[in-house]
């Protein structure tokens, strides 16, 4: 009900959004996500390995293990949506240097994987000063740009405003802060892009 309501609100405002869905939710609510896709919204794959019976965060696993976890999720997604996903987001932004090549190997094309400056090793989520803007990731180092055929669109952050004892940057999740703080995060991001000359 919440996903359908969010889709209706966004459609009424003339917006198209991306819903990333864990396989267990897709199995139960596939019809809702097919409706949302028919309205022009994007539906992609979201992985929390624990929801698939695994013990660790996604970024703890090696290349072959990540491919296996992804393929399990892709199979469920394809059964419900009638197609394979192209978009992907890992739970907790958990990833390692195997992740982008693994995403490429299973045919995923784009998504929100990185959270620049986030430092939560307990979630296998360490992003350092990774790129703030959309980019092709490096094949051997997740924090650099490179030639992996996957477009990473990092979460919008304010690297100067820190949460959780400094481990996490302010981002645009609605549950974190109020609209005024989100305005500042957006404003700073736009000004940064304009100053750098890379806003298009």
Where are each of the predicted segments found?
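N-terminal regions that are enriched for targeting/export leaders
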Residues: 1-8
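Metal-dependent polysaccharide deacetylase catalytic core of the NodB/CE4 family, i.e.
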Residues: 13-96, 148, 157-159
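Active-site-adjacent pocket scaffolds in enzyme catalytic domains
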Residues: 90-200
């Amino acid at each position: 009900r919440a996903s359908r309501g969010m889709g209706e609100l966004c459609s009424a405002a003339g917006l198209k959004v991306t819903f990333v869905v864990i396989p267990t939710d897709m199995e139960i609510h596939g019809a809702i996500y097919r409706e949302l896709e028919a309205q022009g919204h994007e539906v992609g794959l979201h992985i929390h390995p624990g929801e698939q019976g695994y013990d660790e965060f996604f970024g703890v696993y090696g290349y072959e293990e990540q491919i296996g976890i992804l393929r399990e999720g892709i199979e469920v997604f394809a059964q419900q949506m009638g197609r394979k996903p192209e978009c992907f987001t890992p739970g907790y932004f958990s990833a390692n240097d195997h992740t982008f090549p693994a995403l490429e190997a299973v045919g995923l094309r784009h998504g929100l994987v990185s959270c620049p400056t986030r430092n939560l090793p307990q979630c296998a989520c360490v992003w350092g000063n990774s790129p703030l803007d959309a980019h092709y990731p490096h094949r051997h180092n997740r924090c650099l740009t490179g030639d992996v055929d996957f477009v990473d669109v990092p979460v919008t952050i304010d690297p100067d405003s820190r949460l959780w004892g400094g481990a996490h940057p302010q981002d645009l999740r609605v549950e974190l802060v109020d609209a005024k703080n989100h305005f500042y995060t957006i404003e700073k991001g736009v000004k940064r892009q304009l100053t750098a000359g890379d806003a298009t």
